[in-house]
Amino acid sequence: MIEQIYQIVKLNFRLEWQERQSYFSILIYILSSVYLSYLVFSEVISAETWNAFFWVIFIFSAVQAAYRSFHYEADQRFLLYYGMVKPENLVLGKIIYNFLYLYATGLFTALVFTFLMGNEINSLGAFLFILLLASLGFSAILTFVAGISAKASNNPALPAILSIPLLYPQLISLSRVSLRSLTGFSWEVNAPLLIVLALLSLVSLLLSFLLFPYLWRD
């Protein structure tokens, strides 16, 4: 199981690196969005605005990045993978790959924000931990949605239509607790909310793991 998951993650990195334009398109989107925000606010930006713009840019870049999760397994290749890999291993490998991808994307977005808009992060450790939880929860939901989209002939509208409502509960909680990491963070006070976020990410992961085999056999 572990070997199969590792090979799936490795294969995804190799395939995506062969088509580097997907990586570069995400980087260009982040750079252009943050730079536009910089021009609009002319360096005068509050912590609340910094936080809101960060999550808006991150969630849309995450949707765009995860859309390609099953780009290489669509159509007839689903039958080939069905005979070679267990669906549970496949979805876990995809989720791990997307988690690493999204976490790197979030770090790059925060770095660009800090460079252009100023460093508003008061507690770096808390912010990085919150971003990790966000990447895990987003990757689980978006990977499953990408699988549905692949089964529907890679309809480009489905990921945005399905994922935004599913991500909304996590996004609201994330934006609130991440704002506290900008203005002043206490681990003791925010521990219950962090536990809720961790449980939401875990539930998203378990649902993707349990439901994907049924989608795979369809």
Walk through the language-model features, giving the residues of each.
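Aromatic- and glycine-rich beta-strand/loop motifs that create alpha-glucan
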Residues: 1-25
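Transmembrane helix boundary and interhelical loop/hinge segments in multi-pass membrane proteins
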Residues: 16, 63-81
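Hydrophobic alpha-helical transmembrane segments of multi-pass membrane transport/permease proteins
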Residues: 20-41, 54-60, 162-173, 199-208
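Membrane-interfacial helix-loop-helix connectors in multipass membrane proteins
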Residues: 42-45, 111-130, 178-194
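Loop-to-helix entry region at the N-terminal start of transmembrane alpha-helices
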Residues: 43-61, 189-197
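Selective transmembrane-helix segments that form parts of the transport pathway or gating/packing helices
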Residues: 87-114
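A structural motif at transmembrane helix-loop-helix junctions in multipass membrane proteins
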Residues: 132-164, 216-218
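Terminal transmembrane helical anchor/hairpin motif
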Residues: 161-162, 166-218
